[in-house]
């Protein structure tokens, strides 16, 4: 079915190879992405679609604008959801990311810890232990290969995302939801409570136990302004408020 739907300049076999062996720095051909989406959408009769990561190239903007016509959902409202996240936030979320080798649950040694932490005497390092109910539990969570480089391997993708965001923001005739992941430290106390701010965690050994130290996580935004990063809940609230306005509900 996928081969019948595919129309592109790259051979079907090469496109499949790009899918199975893709790296974080390279994007799949647009035509192949559309074929994959069409194939999956055929199985989702009459459902609302939320497509994450489209567009990823400037030529995909036009595809996304007319995508509802391609899938015959002509009467459904469409919109762009644009989120502004400082590169420093992305960088640290990648650098401190750890994954359970058993269930693939993801956490962050600095920003999203588990309930169980252990200290390795030989390494002189703290480790998170997986506590997912889907997992047998107790596995030491490990960093992914290349994560120590942060945003370096995906620099070209980030630059492209910035270009696309600016292009999408300039479009007329399509509603846009604008979200911010961060707010300056100076303004944060005026509009947000402490429980809405992303905490930063560190650890200390004290009387044979591991003490968790928590404080607000501060970063520099892309303009060099000292800022805090919001947790997901206040960002989702902002999304729902704007969505209700667009849908007039």
Positions of the model-derived regions?
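ATP-dependent small-molecule kinase phosphotransfer cores
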Residues: 1-69, 224-228, 235, 239
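Short glycine-/polar-rich loops that comprise or flank the Walker A/P-loop
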Residues: 46, 73-79, 96-97, 172-177
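Conserved Switch II/interswitch segment of TRAFAC-class P-loop GTPases
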Residues: 54-61, 77-80, 85
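Switch/connector loops and helix/strand junctions flanking conserved nucleotide-binding motifs
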Residues: 58-62, 88-94, 109-110, 187-190
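Cys/His-rich short segments
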Residues: 89-156, 160
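NTP-dependent small-molecule kinase module
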Residues: 131-249
């Amino acid at each position: 079915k996928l081969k019948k739907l595919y129309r592109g300049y790259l051979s079907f076999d090469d496109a499949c190879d790009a899918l199975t062996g893709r790296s974080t720095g390279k994007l799949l051909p647009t035509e192949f992405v559309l074929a994959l989406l069409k194939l999956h959408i055929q199985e989702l009769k009459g459902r609302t679609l939320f497509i994450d990561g489209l567009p990823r190239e400037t030529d995909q903007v036009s595809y996304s604008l007319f995508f509802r016509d391609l899938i015959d959902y002509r009467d459904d409202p469409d919109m762009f959801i644009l989120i502004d996240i400082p590169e420093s936030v992305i960088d640290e979320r990648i650098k401190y990311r750890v994954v359970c080798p058993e269930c693939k649950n993801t956490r962050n040694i600095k920003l999203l810890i588990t309930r169980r932490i252990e200290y390795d005497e030989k390494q002189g390092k703290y480790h998170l232990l997986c506590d997912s109910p889907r997992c047998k539990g107790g596995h030491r969570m490990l960093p992914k290969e290349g994560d120590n480089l942060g945003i370096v391997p995906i620099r070209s993708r980030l630059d492209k995302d910035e270009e696309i965001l600016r292009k999408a923001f300039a479009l007329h005739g399509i509603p846009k939801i604008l979200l911010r992941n961060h707010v300056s430290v100076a303004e944060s106390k005026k509009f947000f409570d402490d429980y809405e701010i992303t905490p930063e965690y560190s650890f200390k050994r004290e009387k044979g136990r591991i003490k968790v130290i928590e404080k607000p996580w501060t970063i520099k935004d892309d303009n060099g302004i000292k800022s805090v990063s919001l947790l997901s809940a206040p960002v989702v609230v902002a999304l729902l408020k704007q969505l209700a306005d667009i849908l007039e509900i």
